[in-house]
A protein has these predicted regions:
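Conserved short alpha-helix immediately C-terminal to the canonical SAM/SAH-binding motif I
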Residues: 91, 115-118
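Conserved GNAT acetyl-CoA-binding A-motif
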Residues: 92, 99-112
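Acidic/histidine-enriched, beta-strand-rich ligand/metal-binding domains
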Residues: 74-75, 83, 117-121
């Protein structure tokens, strides 16, 4: 098996990213917020959406928003049929490595309550880092942090 994390670049990449987000993060009944494929945050300076591929098949998504030595991981999802099979940890490890490569020392995330256990197992800690973030899609999320480089 060949795994790769790639920044979203091509029209096919954008389509795959939107498909995964819509099916996993914005599934009917999950949020009252509708998905916006043209949300400006995906293309804002310092924000990079990524896809996790297995043998060229897109399986996961995450966006890394760089804020100096801090990175915020957003919109993390693994396709339904690959969940609970280690792909989330693989995506987490790839994002950590990419963040380190970019000079990020601390990662933060607004974790969905049902994902907190996953993040704890991956070495993250619960830490309130910006309560003003906990609105909209992040309402009800648990803020977490991980130091990835001393």
């Amino acid at each position: 098996m060949s795994y790769e994390l790639r920044a979203v670049m091509t029209p096919d990449d954008w389509r795959a990213m939107h498909d995964i987000r819509q099916k996993v993060l914005f599934a009917p009944g999950r949020h009252s917020i509708s998905y916006d494929e043209n949300h400006p945050d995906d293309r804002a300076d310092g924000n990079t959406p990524f896809l996790l591929f297995e043998n060229e098949e897109p399986l996961g998504v995450a966006r890394l928003d760089e804020r100096g030595e801090t990175g915020i991981v957003r919109l993390v999802a693994i396709v339904q049929h690959k969940q609970r099979k280690g792909y989330g940890l693989r995506l987490n490890n790839f994002i950590e490595a990419e963040a380190r490569r970019r000079g990020v020392r601390i990662l933060r995330v607004n974790a969905a309550p049902d994902a907190v256990g996953f993040y704890l197992k991956a070495g993250w800690s619960e830490k309130l880092w910006d309560p003003t973030e906990l609105v909209g899609l992040a309402q009800g999320a648990i803020q977490m942090e991980k130091v990835i480089c001393e």
